[in-house]
């Protein structure tokens, strides 16, 4: 039996005239049919994840396919029991994924319609994973990798996508002369980043067409060689990919035990995404460090209406005090 909610993940690099007005009109339509989700619109295209009941999502797909240049836009569809979003946002941005090349003095931005890596099918990508002479690079953020990743893939030490070009330049000697294939959640980041690799002089660059989401749904590979879960930017947080031999790779921030539950650090000025159990979240006041645990704006403390005495008691249980610097 089909589940009542569909989640649509999609993007398309396509020139959009008067993109700011397009975003406003798009938001009005989405609200008129009761759709929920998050969509970014830029002069270079559109990138979104939305959710709704079957009829609602069908209306939306029909609407998008009626727009100029979007007739062949590819929707990746998941069925879920509950909505993946609480509200509807459509925002105009400079880029639909922020690689930030111009911000970081990496010359001009990349247009994936002109320069991008070769598309690899799930089977071709699986073959690349098994090839010892191929470098497989995860283009996502560190916390996404830590929840789940392809077996043997390189983990760049980055907290956001715009840090990736500098990381690659810092490690250029390690794989400049090798075949490099990249992957991301749904493909939108790889379209642009693989193009940047080509411009940097890498001779053999490939990308997983349709991203991890498509790999997990492919009837031939069935998500094999993916370890852990896939981080998604909605209420679901994590979804399954490997339907052959799934394992847990996530580790609890505090004690290193297997964990696939993400929370944001209680300190709003840190907001680091950390994997932790409910027990350790309570034990460590959802703070990723002592400084965050004792921060006066710690959201865990306020959300649970903890008194100062209760905070002191929990800190003492882990050998800490209210001092900013732990003993």
UniProtKB/Swiss-Prot annotation:
<dbReference type="GO" id="GO:0006400">
    <property type="term" value="P:tRNA modification"/>
</dbReference>
<dbReference type="Pfam" id="PF17773">
    <property type="entry name" value="UPF0176_N"/>
</dbReference>
<feature type="active site" description="Cysteine persulfide intermediate">
    <location>
        <position position="184"/>
    </location>
</feature>
<dbReference type="InterPro" id="IPR001763">
    <property type="entry name" value="Rhodanese-like_dom"/>
</dbReference>
<dbReference type="InterPro" id="IPR020936">
    <property type="entry name" value="TrhO"/>
</dbReference>
<protein>
    <recommendedName>
        <fullName>tRNA uridine(34) hydroxylase</fullName>
        <ecNumber>1.14.-.-</ecNumber>
    </recommendedName>
</protein>
<dbReference type="InterPro" id="IPR040503">
    <property type="entry name" value="TRHO_N"/>
</dbReference>
<comment type="similarity">
    <text>Belongs to the TrhO family.</text>
</comment>
<dbReference type="Pfam" id="PF00581">
    <property type="entry name" value="Rhodanese"/>
</dbReference>
<dbReference type="GO" id="GO:0016705">
    <property type="term" value="F:oxidoreductase activity, acting on paired donors, with incorporation or reduction of molecular oxygen"/>
</dbReference>
<feature type="domain" description="Rhodanese">
    <location>
        <begin position="130"/>
        <end position="224"/>
    </location>
</feature>
<dbReference type="Pfam" id="PF12368">
    <property type="entry name" value="Rhodanese_C"/>
</dbReference>
<dbReference type="InterPro" id="IPR022111">
    <property type="entry name" value="Rhodanese_C"/>
</dbReference>
<comment type="function">
    <text>Catalyzes oxygen-dependent 5-hydroxyuridine (ho5U) modification at position 34 in tRNAs.</text>
</comment>
<keyword id="KW-0560">Oxidoreductase</keyword>
<dbReference type="InterPro" id="IPR036873">
    <property type="entry name" value="Rhodanese-like_dom_sf"/>
</dbReference>
<keyword id="KW-0819">tRNA processing</keyword>
């Amino acid at each position: 039996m089909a589940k009542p909610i569909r989640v649509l993940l999609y993007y398309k690099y396509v020139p959009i005239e008067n993109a700011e007005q397009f975003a406003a009109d798009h938001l009005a339509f989405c609200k008129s049919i009761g759709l929920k989700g998050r969509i970014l619109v830029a002069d270079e295209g559109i990138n979104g994840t939305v959710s709704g009941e079957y009829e609602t999502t069908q209306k939306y797909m029909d609407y998008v396919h009626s727009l100029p240049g979007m007739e062949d836009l590819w929707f990746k569809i998941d069925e879920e029991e509950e909505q993946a979003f609480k509200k509807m946002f459509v925002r105009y941005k400079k880029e639909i994924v922020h690689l930030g090349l111009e911000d970081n003095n990496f010359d001009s931005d990349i247009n994936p319609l002109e320069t991008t890596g070769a598309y690899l099918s799930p089977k071709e990508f699986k073959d690349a994973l098994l090839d010892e002479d191929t470098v497989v690079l995860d283009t996502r953020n560190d916390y996404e990798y830590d929840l789940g990743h392809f077996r043997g893939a390189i983990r760049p030490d980055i907290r956001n996508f715009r840090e990736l070009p500098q990381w690659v330049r810092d490690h250029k000697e390690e794989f400049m002369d090798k075949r490099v294939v990249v992957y991301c959640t749904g493909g939108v980041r790889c379209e642009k980043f693989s193009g940047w690799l080509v411009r940097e002089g890498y001779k053999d660059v490939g990308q997983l067409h349709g991203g991890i989401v498509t790999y997990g749904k492919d009837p031939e590979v069935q998500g094999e060689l993916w370890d852990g879960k896939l981080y998604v930017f909605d209420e679901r947080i994590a979804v399954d990919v490997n339907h052959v031999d799934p394992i847990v790779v996530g580790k609890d921030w505090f004690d290193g035990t297997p964990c696939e539950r993400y929370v944001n650090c209680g300190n709003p000025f840190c907001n680091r995404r950390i994997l932790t159990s409910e027990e350790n979240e309570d034990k460590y006041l959802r703070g990723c460090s002592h400084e965050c645990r004792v921060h006066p704006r710690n959201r865990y403390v306020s959300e649970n209406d903890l008194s100062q005495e209760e905070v002191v008691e929990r800190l003492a249980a882990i050998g800490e005090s209210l001092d900013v610097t732990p003993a």
